[in-house]
């Protein structure tokens, strides 16, 4: 919350200069942000964020962390998507977004035609990995031991689908939490440059 308070102070009198993207489905609990699908918590978390940011709207309301087809179905058919639609109709968010690490779940979301912005984990190493519901697998050294020479077809299909449908992509984990820039930690076996990571 402190970071949002500080950003809110900085935005005063300058809000129109910034494009804000914020998560739906996060709450502050036990000293950290956590994912929730409980609609009362989703509403409370979003209103708290607007208040702390000293604004009445965001450019993107990003539905947080949808990494399985089951979770996407629950979000899409349940009160979370309905709430996102309401926020958009009220002008509290301009675009509905979604964050994911799983190309299969992300593709289903993009196919709905309601997701206008996708936050997705993209970098030269993750792009070699197959779809999965466990995002921790993206960091697991054993998943980089085989011959990985081509982009995963599901990821490639997702990026092409977003391009064709005009869905914006915001990138997370471009440097893999810094691991890709480290010769010791990079799954590529050597340190990559920032330019290589932002392929």
Q: How would you label these PLM feature ranges?
A:
Residues 1, 21, 57-63, 97-98, ...:
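Short beta-strand segments at enzyme active-site cores
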Residues 1-22, 56, 83, 89:
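N-terminal binding-site loop/beta-alpha segment at the start of enzyme catalytic domains
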Residues 10, 66-199:
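Beta/alpha (TIM)-barrel catalytic core signal, keyed to glycine-rich beta->alpha loops juxtaposed to Asp/Glu
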Residues 17-18, 58, 93, 115:
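Local beta-strand N-terminus motif with an aromatic residue
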Residues 21-33, 62-65, 171, 175-181:
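N-terminal small/glycine-rich loop or linker at the start of catalytic domains
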Residues 24-43, 69-73, 183-192:
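Active-site mouth loops of central-metabolism enzymes
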Residues 40-50, 83:
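Short, well-ordered amphipathic alpha-helical segments that serve as non-catalytic structural scaffolds
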Residues 48-72:
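Active-site groove signature of glycoside hydrolases
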